[in-house]
């Protein structure tokens, strides 16, 4: 039985994960941490992260970027593996994640779904053929009107996958409104749509002369992210210090 601390337990994803874990015979949430104790939980909730002394095997984080620094310090102090699902981290925070991974196991993924992580592999193979042949690469992401960050962490992760396949020769453009020039050959455009209750949609476009190839992933429920986070927590518990991602979970 893997014992989990849920950081951001009163948020939507925290509640989704709590519901899923209740039905999981191999995992248990033993404590929650959130700025407000407004969730419907069967476990104790702490509004101050340092007040949580509950013994656990791993922590799952679905909170906000502003809480990331204190969270990482807390996990290092307790030698607690962390599944970091929060997006919108600054460059300084991303650097801190890498430093933290030298001390404890850290699994960071912008998107926890099996489908998205499979898509990342597919588009890398496509990029090696199509981008090399001169196809332009664009990403369009769509999310609900309440999402705070743009582009989404998943869109940036998809862009990173494309760029990695092309030896990091590309740069990203997410705003063309102030530019009066044609598209650069070595850019990956990223466009964001916000509206309604869209859970998450990501489209990767390879646009060539007289032909277009599109890869698309649509999330109909946030439960897919919760399931992935739980599987990641089970995988990470007991692992040595290091930087992990969902590819490690998928490969076992």
Give, region by region, the residue ranges found by the protein language model.
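An anion/phosphate-binding loop that grips the pyrophosphate of nucleotide cofactors and donors
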Residues: 56
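C-terminal substrate-binding/catalytic lobe of Rossmann-fold NAD(P)-dependent oxidoreductases
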Residues: 7, 12-50, 132-252
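Rossmann-like NAD(P)H-binding beta-loop-alpha module
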Residues: 118-134, 150
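Extreme N-terminal starter segment of soluble prokaryotic enzymes
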Residues: 1-5
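Hydrophobic beta-strand scaffold residues
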Residues: 29, 45, 82-83, 106-108
């Amino acid at each position: 039985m893997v014992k989990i601390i849920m950081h951001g337990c009163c948020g939507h994803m925290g509640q989704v994960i709590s519901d899923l874990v209740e039905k999981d015979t191999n995992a248990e949430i033993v404590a929650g941490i959130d700025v407000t104790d407004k969730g419907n939980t069967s476990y104790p909730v702490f509004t101050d992260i340092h007040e949580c002394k509950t013994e656990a095997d791993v922590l799952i984080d679905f909170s906000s970027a502003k809480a990331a620094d204190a969270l990482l310090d807390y996990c290092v102090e307790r030698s607690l593996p962390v599944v970091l699902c929060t997006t919108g981290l600054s460059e300084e925070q991303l650097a801190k994640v890498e430093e933290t991974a030298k001390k404890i196991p850290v699994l960071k993924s912008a998107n926890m779904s099996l489908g998205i992580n499979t898509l990342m592999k597919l588009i890398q193979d496509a990029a090696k053929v199509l981008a090399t042949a001169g196809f332009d690469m664009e990403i369009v992401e769509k999310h609900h009107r309440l999402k705070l960050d743009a582009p989404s962490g998943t869109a940036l992760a998809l862009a990173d996958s494309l760029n990695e396949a092309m030896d990091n020769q590309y740069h990203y453009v997410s705003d063309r409104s102030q530019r009066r020039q044609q598209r650069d050959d070595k850019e990956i455009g990223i466009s964001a749509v916000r509206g309604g209750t869209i859970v998450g949609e990501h489209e990767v476009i390879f646009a060539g002369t007289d032909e277009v190839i599109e890869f698309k992933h649509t999330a109909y429920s946030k439960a897919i992210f919760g399931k992935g986070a739980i599987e990641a927590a089970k995988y990470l518990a007991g692992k040595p210090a290091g930087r992990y991602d969902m590819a490690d979970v998928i490969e076992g």
